[in-house]
Amino acid sequence: MAVSLREYRARIKSTESMKKITRAMELIAASRIIKAQQRAQSAAPYARELTRAVSAVATYSNVDHPLTREPENSQRVAMLIVTSDRGLAGAYSSSVLKEAERLAEKLRGEGKTIDVYLCGRKGEAYHRFRNRPVVRSWTGFSDQPSYDAALEVGTTLIDAFLDEEGEHAVDEVHVVYTRFRSMLLQEPTAVRLLPLEVVEGEERPASDEVLPLYEFEPSAEAVLDNLLPQYVQSRIFFAFLQAAASELAARQKAMKSATDNADELIKKYTRIANQARQAGITQEISEIVGGVNALADAQAGSE
């Protein structure tokens, strides 16, 4: 019984150590979520004004730009999947990968071939384990994305879309990422990025507001050539920021659940250890009483 008691005490000690780690990771994720939300909010004005500028050019000119041109027969699709670099985030990566599988099944049903692009080591490991080809992957920034990373990814996807005869030329570009709705809800989302469908925001001008007349210098084509790539990159950066906040929220929830489970295990092991200790004490008392009775019987027999 003493050996069993030592085992339970060792389990309690190891569980307490694990609880300290998960609690620390929960607090770190909570603090980073606030920063991730602030980054997303600070990037919103730029994205909003950029969308308005692109919408203005598209509305007040009749330019046919390659990034907005619908293909006559779409046959090849690029799919960017945004996962995490690290684990301990619950079902975060598996959920976005399931959404990517659903999208891939839908696209294959339409007779389209898929080129996979990945962000995050979890996506890399998923495809490597299944021996699935990946055109290109990026890692190292899933929880703290930079605009430079979005610029590199966006440039790669734009080049693949504009390339008409290359090995990895595509007719469409889709992005699968996790959208941050709230601390309790993160939603895997799939959106078509290219060809672009520029939509104005929900804000509408007031009835008495005078809408401006635009003049494009040097030309509407030149303005679009500069704005549209930035627009694509800003949307990718938005997806990265949303995914980062979602990853941190998922990690906080997972670590809180692990901490709560550790508390339950500690209570369980403590209760069992106390029962084992009480059983050991009871057995020792019984043995002492039995020994005393046996000694008394022996003395009575000798008399």
From Swiss-Prot:
Q: Which GO terms describe its biological process?
A: proton motive force-driven plasma membrane ATP synthesis
Q: Which residues form the signal peptide?
A: none
- GO MF term (any one): ATP binding
Q: Give the record's membrane topology.
A: Peripheral membrane protein
Q: Which UniProt keywords apply?
A: ATP synthesis, Cell membrane, CF(1), Hydrogen ion transport, Ion transport, Membrane, Transport
Which is a Gene Ontology cellular component entry for this protein? plasma membrane
Compartments where found: Cell membrane
What InterPro entries does the record point to? Answer: ATP_synth_F1_ATPase_gsu, ATP_synth_F1_gsu
Role noted for this protein: Produces ATP from ADP in the presence of a proton gradient across the membrane. The gamma chain is believed to be important in regulating ATPase activity and the flow of protons through the CF(0) complex.
Q: Which HAMAP family match?
A: ATP_synth_gamma_bact
Q: How does it assemble?
A: F-type ATPases have 2 components, CF(1) - the catalytic core - and CF(0) - the membrane proton channel. CF(1) has five subunits: alpha(3), beta(3), gamma(1), delta(1), epsilon(1). CF(0) has three main subunits: a, b and c.
Family affiliation: Belongs to the ATPase gamma chain family.
**What is the protein name for this chain?**
ATP synthase gamma chain
Q: Which organism is it from?
A: Nocardioides sp. (strain ATCC BAA-499 / JS614)
The record's gene field reads atpG
